[in-house]
Amino acid sequence: MQAWDTDLRWETTFANRNAKTLTKLLFHKQTLPGFNDSGAHLANIGFYDGNLRALKIAQQEGLQQVSRMVHRLTELPAKFFGINAGLVRLGAQADLCIIDPVALEKWDPEKTYHFIHRSQFGCRQIVNRPDAVVRNVIIGGKMVWDNGIYSEDFGKTASGRVIRAKDHPLEQGKM
């Protein structure tokens, strides 16, 4: 232990190991696969790739399953929470993520994670950044990520907004 100190690391898969079971759960009518706890671990684990992994699994099942998974990751949770998002339509929040299907197919999630130093927290963090899978990100109608490069305004000006409970129809007295 003295020789390794904080460089000692090991890998353990403690859930979702069986691909068949995981696929069944991702597509089960009583699950909401777009929700994960990736934002809960900012100081140690920051994978944020649960949705990309779900799309990759769907892709292995065929194009129809990709369409179903996009629906399950976007429109379905928006409807569940009663918010005007999750669809590309007039008046909806215009946040889009453009994914390269060839890069997604080639991506091996177990080989793209690495450590970065988080000066804000004074520690290292494990991140999973799949190069070239996410081609573009558009928030509030503004391009913020284009082929691996943040826009000049990213982090300096607001692009979109957080959807809060007050946006729910119940909170607005509409239900």
Regions found by a protein language model. Give the residues of each.
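Active-site microenvironment of metallo-dependent hydrolases
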Residues: 1-175
